[in-house]
Amino acid sequence: MEDLYKIRFKKLKELSLRHNNISDIKVLEYFKFEKLETLKLRHNNISDIGILEKVNFKNLKHLSLYDNKISDITVLEKVKFEKLEMLNLGGNILSDINILEKVNFKELKELYLDNNKIIDITVFWKTKFEKLEKLGLENNKLDKIRFAFLIIKLKLKIKEFTM
């Protein structure tokens, strides 16, 4: 395992591992992705994303975890993706997204949470996503009254909203 620390991808900007059978992404901790901007882990069997707090993806702009088995995103509070612009967590089994209140992705422009089990979206009253332009929440179990209030809050800030 110590040899893995020496592996560096000095120029790699995009890593796509879509449509595999990956369940454990802990190995990402051992690689140095100095210029990685896009990481695509769609359509796998990932349930634990805790390792994301240990990786150093200082240039990461796009992270897609669509269609996995993720139910817990509390690690996002500790993640240091200062340049992250797009986060896709759609197609998982998320129900509680209240941690988003504590997440500090200052550059986030697109957030996709579609195809989950989300009921309560009042957390968006408290989020700090000042640059958010697109929010995908379709195919969840949203409460209509809370949704109506959210739309009023987001109307002027977000360019595209899907439900």
Regions found by a protein language model. Name each.
Residues M1, K117, K141-I145:
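Intrinsically disordered low-complexity regions specifically enriched for long asparagine
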Residues M1-L4, I22, I46, F161:
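Generic low-polarity alpha-helical segments
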Residues E2-F9, K26-F33, G50-F57, I73-F81, ...:
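A structural signal for leucine-rich repeat
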Residues F9-E14, H19, H43, L142, ...:
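Positively charged, low-complexity intrinsically disordered regions
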Residues K13-L17, L36-L41, L60-L65, L84-L89, ...:
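Conserved hydrophobic beta-strand positions in leucine-rich repeat
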